[in-house]
Amino acid sequence: MRSDKIKLGFDKAPHRSLLKATGAIQSDEDFQKPFIGIANSYIDIIPGHVHLHDFAKRIKEAVRKAGGIPFEFNTIGVDDGIAMGHIGMRYSLASRELIADAVETVVGAHWLDAMICIPNCDKIVPGMMMAAVRLDIPTIFISGGPMKVGVMADGEKVDLISVFEGVGEYSSGKIDDARLKELENNGCPTCGSCSGMFTANSMNCLAEALGLALPGNGTILAVDPKREALAEAAAKQIMTLVEKDIKPSDLLSRESFLNAFALDLAMGGSTNTILHTLAIANEAGINFDLAELNTLAAKTPYICKVSPATKNVHIEDVDRAGGISAILKELSKLDGVLDLSRPTVTGKTLGENIADAEVKDKAVIHSVEDPYSATGGLAVLFGNLAPQGCVVKTGAVDPKMMQHTGPARIYESQDEAISGILKGDVQAGEVVVIRYEGPKGGPGMPEMLAPTSTIMGQGLGDKVALITDGRFSGGTRGACIGHVSPEAAERGPIAALQNGDKITIDIPNKRIAVDLSDEEIEARLKALPPFEPKIKRGYLARYSQMVTSAGSGAVLKSFD
């Protein structure tokens, strides 16, 4: 066992003495058992994580009962909703790298034999996945589970996005104080990751397709007793993975990631999933061209529409309808979409995992013969405005905005944009541009949920497009195009735009362009002053210097 390095031999007496002091070692026989790291992410200020302290206790008990010795440690976390709309959001994406490094550090320093990862919300899931791939020890993921949907007094279903959009409705006089307060009080009714197909839930669902989690990981509610049963099953299964030495490198391949992308396209997951999946694949030494996603999308139908793409279906409905296994089972009817032979943490192949799955509600999970659209719910656009690509959640775009041409309204930051939108500056037909908010420029590529929700709340969702080198919340809906690469801080073409420039967005044909010649773009870029970092000390200053583009997953530069 790996852990023998810290526990066996006469020279390890000091190590054993320290280990006995933890209370985890109850007898000398325990030194003959595998040491299992419990990578938890309990934190009081994130509703998706407030229950993970007790959740981890149950997992530790199950590990010990199964013959392992559990050692729990915690990572940091950022709640994207609470960090939204102010400087705090700059820390969100950057926290992913800290989490990956922190998990690597604890496991690497203490030579743990295996790991159970307990993430839930946005950056914690991919951060732990990156660490798991990097460490390459037997690992299983068990998330904390989704939140229940909120219900208003009149029976209307609401979620966090309803509250954000309520701010826009309130600012434009569409609702009063009482309505906004009711939304506030009902949007997030329980612990768990927010109830729609937002980034956290999207990533927890993708863990099933990647083969890193047991079936049910992405959709069983945090407050459902089945979640605790799944956690106990994961604790038992980690011992099997240790016994058979099944590691992430045995499970993850290019085909595994394509399976995850196919699921993402079929359920219209968050655009952030592209960023994170690229980063996880990078850790595995697997590189993807963003154009590959469009090729896959062309043969992957969009069959499960969940909030924010619709207001009446949430993650709990997907679970009731058969869960991720049912979506994958439906996709398996199509040739060339899934590789069902890929191994998973269950000890079975993906195909074996979903063999008995069935769609229990066809209003929630459509058949491949009757999709919402014949192509996937995400797309990558290319053109002279985004030579390296940009992404859009097509499943959440109003049909009227799938093709749009309009004048640019430029904002140099998210704060400037929010102020302008709230003042009523944005007019129907315009293309709002928010720049210098990319991985380097932000820094941290902040999410744009506040401006997009305000636009929706003001009734402009089918009249205005928004493009940015930043990114969007998984809860964003509308013609919102993010991850524009290269970013403005790297002298990307988005930095050359001026108010009134004509921008054309053509989602069906995967194109985005500004009506300027290459020569004009180049001349404007040459005339710009050097980029001046917004933050010059601390972690974000270092992050800004080391981060790469969104097109490569916004990972840190390699020094290999």
UniProtKB/Swiss-Prot annotation:
Summary of subunit composition and partner proteins: Homodimer.
Active site (catalytic residues): S473 (proton acceptor)
Reaction(s) this enzyme catalyzes, per UniProt: (2R)-2,3-dihydroxy-3-methylbutanoate = 3-methyl-2-oxobutanoate + H2O; (2R,3R)-2,3-dihydroxy-3-methylpentanoate = (S)-3-methyl-2-oxopentanoate + H2O
Upper lineage: Bacteria, Pseudomonadati, Chlorobiota, Chlorobiia, Chlorobiales
Positions that bind Mg(2+): D80, D122, K123, E447
An example Gene Ontology molecular-function term: 2 iron, 2 sulfur cluster binding
Identification of the protein by name: Dihydroxy-acid dehydratase
Record pathway: Amino-acid biosynthesis; L-isoleucine biosynthesis; L-isoleucine from 2-oxobutanoate: step 3/4; Amino-acid biosynthesis; L-valine biosynthesis; L-valine from pyruvate: step 3/4
